[in-house]
Curated annotation (Swiss-Prot):
Maturation-removed propeptide residues: 26-75, 112-116
Protein name per Swiss-Prot or TrEMBL: Diuretic hormone class 2
GO molecular function, one term: G protein-coupled receptor binding
UniProt source species: Drosophila melanogaster (Fruit fly)
Subcellular location per the Swiss-Prot or TrEMBL entry: Secreted
Function: Regulation of fluid secretion. Stimulates Malpighian tubules fluid secretion by activating the apical membrane V-ATPase via cyclic AMP of principal cells in the main secretory segment.
Family: Belongs to the diuretic hormone class 2 family.
Annotated signal peptide: 1-25
Record lineage: Eukaryota, Metazoa, Ecdysozoa, Arthropoda, Hexapoda
Ranges that cross the membrane: none
Keyword Glycoprotein attributed: no
GO CC, any one term: extracellular space
Length: 116
């Protein structure tokens, strides 16, 4: 039974090797001429320049319009900092939290084992 399985596995392996060796790889795009004089296919060469310029101006206008809409928006994030005294209080609170979380910030200094 094991000889039969071994023969079958060997035959299958031989078949796979023959199938792989007979397959030819597809040529690289730069190697195939494809009727383009050996230069390969370039998608940008077929797009007219006026179309590209039109697309660029349209995208430019869209970006400028989006930036202006963002600058003129009434709904900005200010965390209440522009509301007088309460905004100043909030700013001081946030600065204190940032200082407390900073490694060299206020508070008791921790000594390392080498300083003792």
């Amino acid at each position: 039974m094991t000889n039969r399985c071994a023969c079958f596995a060997l035959a299958f392996l031989l078949f796979c090797l023959l199938a792989i060796s007979s397959i030819e790889a597809a040529p690289m795009p730069s190697q195939s001429n494809g009727g383009y004089g050996g230069a390969g296919y370039n998608e940008l060469e077929e797009v007219p320049d006026d179309l590209l310029m039109e697309l660029m101006t349209r995208f430019g206008r869209t970006i400028i319009r989006a930036r202006n809409d963002l600058e003129n928006s009434k709904r900005t994030v200010d965390f209440g900092l522009a509301r007088g005294y309460s905004g100043t209080q909030e700013a001081k609170h946030r600065m204190g939290l940032a200082a407390a979380n900073f490694a060299g910030g206020p508070g008791r200094r921790r000594r390392s084992e080498t300083d003792v």
